[in-house]
Structure formats: C-alpha cells, structure tokens
Amino acid sequence: ITDGEYKSLAVISEDGPDQFWFVVERTIGGATKKYIELYTPEIFLDSMISYSGSATASVSGLAHLEGKTVQITADGAVHPDLVVSSGAITLNYTATDIKVGLKYVSKLTPTRYGSTSNAGTPLGKMKRWNKIFVRLDTSAIPIINGQRPPVRSPGTNFGNEEPVVSEDIEVRNLGYDLDGRIEIEQDLPLACHIVSIFGTLSVGD
C-alpha cells in the first residue's frame, strides 16, 4: 500500500475470482480519511480511478488524491507523473482510456546463490554476475539490480504505445558483492510477469 494504512479487509466470494475489499486510511489535505478500495490484480496503481470515453486530456473526480503525485497510463502508455490540484489533472495529450492512481513499486529478491561446485562452497566469497537474463511474458521491462535496459525499441515511433515484451532481458557486469543477490523492481504501472531468471556468475577466492 502507498501512503496509508489498511484498517480492515473483507473477501467476497462470487462466480470467478474472489474479491478483496479494503478500508484504507489516508491523509489528504491534512485530514485523515478512510476509503473503501477494491484490489484489482490487473491494475498496477493504488487508489485508482479510470476513464473510458471520447478523447480528453482532463481527468476529474480525484478529490481523494488531492495534492498527491499520481502515476498515469493513457491508452496503455505511461504518461509523466502529475500532481492533483482541485481534484483534477490535465494530461499532456488526449487519450480515450486513462488510469490514474498512486505509484507503488513491486520487488522480487530471489534466494541468494549457494550451490556448491568442485571448487567448494561459494559462501563467504566475492561474487559477480557477468550476465543476468530475466525472461518476461507480456510485461513491461523492469529494473534489474538498479539497471533498466532500454524501454523503447528503435522501431517504435514516438507517440505510439511501446508494446510489452515476451523475451529475455539482459543486463551485464553488475559488480562484486558477497551475496550475489538479484533484485528486480517494477516501478511502472504496467505488468511484470517473470518466467525465469538465469545468467553467468563468477565466484572469487
């Protein structure tokens, strides 16, 4: 959760997936307020509202986010962050499908490497990932150990949505440490479906 506290949770079972409803307490404009929010796993924003209709650059109905910096997707593309003022925002361009909400960062830290070899245990030795590959399925490119590979491909024209990818994303030469840890973060309001993580690791003495 971003910028607030969970106060209550209810799970409603219906046809299809269970629904998760929360009472969330947030401070808006210096006042403490409680909101009822529905968890939607396909939406990657907190306290989100959506608009679908004729092309517009103005989104209102954001009084519950007054003064907050919000993330936005416009027709599937990430729009620069904006600050809510008078319960509204104005985009840099028009769109027909807009989602607005609070940013959160999803993080994945796999178990550290500890497999033995003919050289013995790697524990207590300096390690370096020469290459890390993260296999994605229909996902936006995440940050891998502090690096985000290029998000846009040369063939995508500006003003067009960058399609999500289903491929192996590579980062190289990540420096030495004792743990050889991998950390993957997604700070964009887009999907991040990780199929596997693999690469080449050097272990020192």
What are these regions (language model features)?
Residues I1-D205:
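Beta-sheet repeat architectures centered on beta-propellers
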